[in-house]
Amino acid sequence: MATSLQSVIVLDFGSQYTQLIARRIREIGIYSEIFPYHTKAETIRAHQPKAIILSGGPNSVYDEKAFMPDPEVFSLGVPVLGICYGLQAIAKHFGGNVESSSKQEFGRAKMLVNHDESESLLFRDIPDSDVWMSHGDKVTQLPEGFRVTASTANAEVCAIESFGSKAALKVYGLQFHPEVQHSLYGKQLLSNFLIDIAGITPDWSPKSFIQHQIEEIKRVAGDSTVVCGISGGVDSTVAAVLVSKAIGDKLHCVFVDNGLLRKDEAVKVMEFLKPLGLNISLVDASDLFLGRLKGVASPEKKRKIIGRTFIQVFEKNIHDEKFLVQGTLYPDVIESVSVKGPSETIKSHHNVGGLPKRMKLKLIEPLRELFKDEVRAVGRELGIAEDILMRHPFPGPGLAVRVLGSLTRERLDVLRDADQIFIDELKSSGLYSKVWQAFSVLLPVQSVGVMGDKRTYENVLALRAVESTDGMTADWAHLPHDFLAKVSNRIINEVRGINRVVYDISSKPPATIEWE
């Protein structure tokens, strides 16, 4: 990111909330990055952060192979805030003691701020309030030069900070999770740490991001031509518009119709992308894809066939382009870096691992620093219509992973018709924008039914709708029963070949959002 931005580094110890910490910081208007906990201090110093945050984690600091930060992190001259496991790592590093607690805390707890001590900048304007706990260990002995600034009924040491001879270190620790919404003053507390203690001036915004990216794209691409595979989804659309702002008609977008799109998708996508002024070529390769997928039931084989065929089609539509635009997001980048150590195998994300090396295309990933909600905010700043920005995520393999079992044109058409009814009803009921993602799945089973006094033996369709903020975790959407009944009745009566509709009430984890 631009060196002029003041940034915060979050060291990840494996917490499920690490990304949430980074997002909360950005909501305050400050740029944040996530690094593995084992990142060396000299690497951190090179990024010139104004503050460092140690995340929570699932382990115990007294384990033989406990995750610990580079000790020199505390000598970089910037404020450090430890959250949950991060607090315990601080206590251990400075000579305190951490033990397993006989009274674990999970969920809401009442935090009592220690008003007897001289005012803590961290707790300025923060009263006694509910906080979110998730820990089984506790600090039983404070390190020398630290004081307790808050407690709960089960955690005498709920918050600590350096003082006296160690005050200049500006090291703070919280046993609770300020990044979680259930911690009522959590965002205010983070703001106190970043602005009042670290002295950071908020300068991160969609507008500043766009300005920097346009400059960077111009610098990287120069006079070269650039190609972008566009799908009509949020990520590829925002990425394409952003690159187009930088290099104009030197960007060539390719939209491949693989025959696995939603009903009338190709026509709709071309229509709503037209006002954006992008140079787009529509390639109809549906016969090629469906021919190769005919009769294939294995989801892994489907993905491999689709991936290989897409590469071949895409390659034929590339001319003298030197760069490839991809809509890689920050969670994709984070998932590719292990917190377990530098010796662990790095996972190659699907966005960057598929195109053959012989194409010799260099990557431009203008969104790789953004979370999904930030992509939408950037899209709004770019003037992209809300209908495009709020489209639900759609898997790369398309309907191939929503038609379970053998893939045929007929089964795809059945799914398209049913899914269109589901989505139309969500929109007309004002529910579409209230769920993260909604879709239909055609199951590889049939069931007995009765229609018009005749016995039927036809397909079962599953409806899936989930609520989420980033797709990393998700809960099933509690749609009204009357709404589900209406959708079910319409599908059974209007879509030939379906006689039973079910609703998926699984959350992620343990289930995934998609069925395949």
UniProtKB/Swiss-Prot annotation:
InterPro entries: Class_I_gatase-like, GATASE, GMP_synth_C, GMP_synth_GATase, GMP_synthase, GMPS_ATP_PPase_dom, NAD/GMP_synthase, Rossmann-like_a/b/a_fold. GO terms for cellular component: cytosol. Signal peptide: none annotated. Keywords: ATP-binding, Glutamine amidotransferase, GMP biosynthesis, Ligase, Nucleotide-binding, Purine biosynthesis. It is an enzyme of class 6 (ligase). The active site is at 84 (nucleophile), 177, 179. Residues 204-391 form the GMPS ATP-PPase domain. Pathway: Purine metabolism; GMP biosynthesis; GMP from XMP (L-Gln route): step 1/1. Its EC number is 6.3.5.2. ATP binds at residues 231-237. Pfam families: GATase (PF00117), GMP_synt_C (PF00958), NAD_synthase (PF02540). One of its GO terms (molecular function) is GMP synthase activity. It catalyses: XMP + L-glutamine + ATP + H2O = GMP + L-glutamate + AMP + diphosphate + 2 H(+). Residues 7-203 form the Glutamine amidotransferase type-1 domain. The keyword Cytoplasm does not apply. Catalyzes the synthesis of GMP from XMP. Homodimer. This is GMP synthase [glutamine-hydrolyzing]. It comes from Chlorobaculum tepidum (strain ATCC 49652 / DSM 12025 / NBRC 103806 / TLS) (Chlorobium tepidum). The gene is guaA.
